[in-house]
Amino acid sequence: MNKILVPTGYMGSGSSAVTDILAEIDGCSARDGDFEFVFLHCPNGVFDLEDKLLHGNNAIRSDEALHSFLGTMKQLCTKKYWWVGHYNEHVGPGFYDLCLRFVDELTFSRPNYYWYWQENTNARMFVELCIRKIVWLLTLKKVQLRKPRTYYDTMLSIPTEEEFYSAASRFISGVMDEIGLQEHNIVLDQLLLPHNLFRVDNYFGDELRVFEVSRDPRDVFIQNKYVWRSRNNAVVFPTDAEEFAQFYRRLRGSERPSGSAKVLKLQFEDLIYNYDASMEQIYAFLGVTKAQHSAPRTHFDPAKSIQNTQLSRANEQYAREAEIIAPYTEQYKSQYTDGVKRTIDFRSAPNVTNDCYFFRFAEKDGSKTVIIV
């Protein structure tokens, strides 16, 4: 059976290290690199649809849920310049047809009425309302055009849990086949997020393998503040140390544990300081042998990655901020406190260019440059 392999974690927590390790194992490389597949957990994605249809649903709420789902899925297919989109390329041309089939399977009635959500006036509707009024006046109130709406087809869906999960599982299976699961293993970065993992047994069979990677929150903070923000990338965490600490504790505390055998929890630091034992865990989880790890340390090299740990040791500023964070996040801290000869001071790393989980140093024009690979 081919596998769906999903590296996931918290921004800057090291899940790309797993993607790199998988690339070293026969038959496990990622066709789409670090492209993030979001159709399950994005706003108005499959999981939002689940929550709307199975919790607090009613006759008109389901109509909004189905239309919002289809609208977002269509944007993922067709919207230009949206980096999470382009599903016609990353998934396949049949993706939106699968979405339509999924919604059709969930819809039990298409009544001939409308509700206030469909009357939320936009620019197109305003023009149509003006035309409607003019026609009504010119015909001496004899001709009344159809009242404009945001959309005209009302869809009702009040599924049981079994009906919803069965339809959703068929939909996801179709998407996976569109990507190529029938031919080979597929690696889908961030298909699931840590906060969604309690749901996986409702949607997937034994073909799923999720690698949930966490990391010392002090290093997550330093990486986000001094790498991502310096590159003008969106940073999802606060960059004030105390605010980050409270945010991170609440974020992790809000997670519902999954307990699924389809999920392997990994600590980024273990992949480095306890490499051999971590690899044995990964082999067992994947059902592969060590011999199938045919190119070890060619994509992920713990000897290099160690420089990307214990970052608070790089300078006094990092150390002060890490000291503020530590009391709030004791249960998430790394157990490793030594073994690092040199860590990265991101303030003096001028050419930070890509998602970084390990580093190499290169000489360029006689000066030392940090290159992130």
Language-model segments: residues:
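A polyampholytic, Gly/Pro-enriched intrinsically disordered region
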Residues: 50-61, 231-241, 312-320
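PAPS-dependent sulfotransferase catalytic domain
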Residues: 108-293, 362, 366-372
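PAPS-dependent sulfotransferases, especially Golgi type II membrane carbohydrate sulfotransferases
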Residues: 1-5, 114, 135, 252-262, ...
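Short aromatic-enriched loop/helix-cap "lid" or pocket-rim segments at secondary-structure transitions
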Residues: 41-47, 223-226, 277-279, 307-309
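PAPS-dependent sulfotransferase catalytic core
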Residues: 1-162, 302
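A generic structural motif
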Residues: 32-35, 214, 293-299
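Noncatalytic linker/hinge segments flanking ATPase motor cores
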Residues: 47-51, 72-76, 227-234, 250-260, ...
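Short secondary-structure junctions and interdomain/linker hinges
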Residues: 60, 80, 106-113, 141, ...
